[in-house]
């Protein structure tokens, strides 16, 4: 058992300190802030090491913010937007480390005194800092990384040996990235070199706690996984997220002037592909005449012309706007996808990355939306997007989306995760 920070008790629980390391977008940070709020409610300490861009979000939940000296958009460009192969990812991680030589020192300082270190794929360097300080770890994934026959990022099939085989190169790929990016640091602090046979699934002879903060409806856990791998449900409280948002009069007028619109949002990552996708989607909306509210961060002022069919908007709380629309079109990010499904909305995913395409496939598989489009796998044309939009609003997905909404609302991801953390750390 790892020693706890203090003997202060709340009921039967022993107080602990957890440090999460997050590199990525709001979708990577917000679930951790929600989990942190739950852990603090239970009497534990929770802190998040991440970009300055997320300070306000984190501190609004009462969670301790620790600054990681990196720019969130810059990180996303190297580790997500430009990521097409494992080698690209390794190059991005290596370049990021080269441009931010204090990464590991910052991480070591942030996690000292912790009882558990949590990290996602883009922050896998935190695992090595935790190993150096002999602190247990928890991995956080938003798409399947543990082998299963049921589904895979790398196969369009389901429930087959081919699906299971698609995972074969994944551990070696992660090890290769690590060898390129971190073996120099590991040797400098006296840790053994990471090898191609090394695995992230265990540390110091113990299996690493693993979380998938997504719905079991979309991603049923493989019974063969066992402990300590958990598909928990989403980590957020959507009913609290709208806050004191005041609807602009122009939006109120648009909503009241015709049929319920769809909501279109593709995130903020800087990418030529994203800019092209937004323009194609606008052309498809104009061609079909479908009313839409469009959150467009890469559309120029010249193109942002409100009409009786299109309304452009910047930041807006998703739980709020999802109550006002009939369907949603987005890039397939785990949190955005979950919020839309929880709201009972038919969903069309036009993905920029493989994990997003996976969730689009899952949405389609459970009957909540059309087959997804993937800008890197198919030549996304105006015709393809227009056809998918018309299918989305045809009504064929409405009843199933409402059924799935009820199932997702029965899950409580933050409570499930918090219970698992307390059990794991106390063992």
Question: Which residues fall in each region the model found?
Answer:
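Nucleotide-activated sugar donor-binding and catalytic core shared by glycosyltransferases
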Residues: 7-9, 16-49, 53-65, 88, ...
């Amino acid at each position: 058992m790892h020693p706890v920070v203090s003997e202060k008790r709340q009921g039967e629980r022993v107080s602990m300190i957890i440090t999460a390391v997050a590199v990525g977008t709001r979708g990577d940070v917000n679930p951790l802030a929600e989990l942190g709020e739950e852990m603090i409610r239970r009497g534990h300490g929770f802190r998040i090491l991440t970009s300055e861009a997320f300070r306000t979000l984190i501190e609004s939940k009462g969670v301790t913010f620790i600054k990681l000296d990196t720019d969130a958009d810059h990180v996303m460009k190297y580790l997500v937007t430009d990521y097409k192969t494992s080698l690209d990812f390794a190059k991005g991680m290596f370049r990021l480390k080269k441009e931010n030589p204090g990464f590991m020192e910052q991480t070591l300082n942030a996690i000292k005194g912790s009882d558990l270190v949590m990290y996602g794929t883009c922050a896998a360097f935190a695992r090595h800092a935790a190993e150096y300080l002999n602190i247990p770890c928890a991995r956080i994934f938003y798409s399947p990384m543990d082998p299963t026959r049921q589904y895979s990022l790398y196969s369009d099939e389901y429930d087959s040996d081919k699906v299971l085989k698609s995972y074969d190169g994944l551990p070696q790929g992660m090890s290769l990235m690590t060898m390129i990016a971190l073996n120099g640091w590991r040797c400098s602090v006296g840790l053994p070199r990471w090898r191609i046979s090394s695995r992230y699934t265990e540390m110091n002879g113990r299996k690493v706690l693993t979380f998938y903060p997504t719905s079991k409806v979309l991603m049923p856990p493989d019974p063969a996984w066992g402990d300590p791998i958990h598909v928990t449900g989403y980590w957020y409280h959507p009913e609290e997220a709208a806050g004191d948002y005041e609807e602009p009069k122009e939006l109120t007028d648009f909503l009241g002037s015709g049929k319920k619109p769809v909501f279109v949002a593709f995130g903020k990552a800087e990418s030529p592909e994203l800019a092209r996708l937004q323009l194609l989607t606008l052309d498809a909306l104009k061609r079909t005449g479908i009313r839409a509210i469009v959150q467009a961060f890469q559309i120029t002022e010249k193109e942002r012309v409100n009409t009786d069919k299109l309304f452009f908007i910047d930041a807006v709380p998703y739980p709020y706007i999802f109550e006002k629309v009939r369907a949603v079109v987005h890039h397939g990010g785990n949190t955005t996808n979950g919020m839309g499904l929880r709201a009972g909305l038919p969903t069309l995913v036009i993905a920029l990355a493989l994990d997003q395409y996976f969730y689009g496939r899952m949405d389609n598989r459970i009957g909540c939306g059309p087959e997804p489009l993937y800008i890197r796998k198919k030549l996304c044309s105006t015709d393809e997007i227009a056809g998918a939009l018309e299918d989305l609003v045809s009504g064929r997905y409405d009843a199933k989306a409402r059924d799935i909404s009820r199932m997702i609302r029965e899950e409580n991801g933050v409570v499930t995760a918090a219970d698992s953390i307390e059990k794991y750390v106390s063992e």
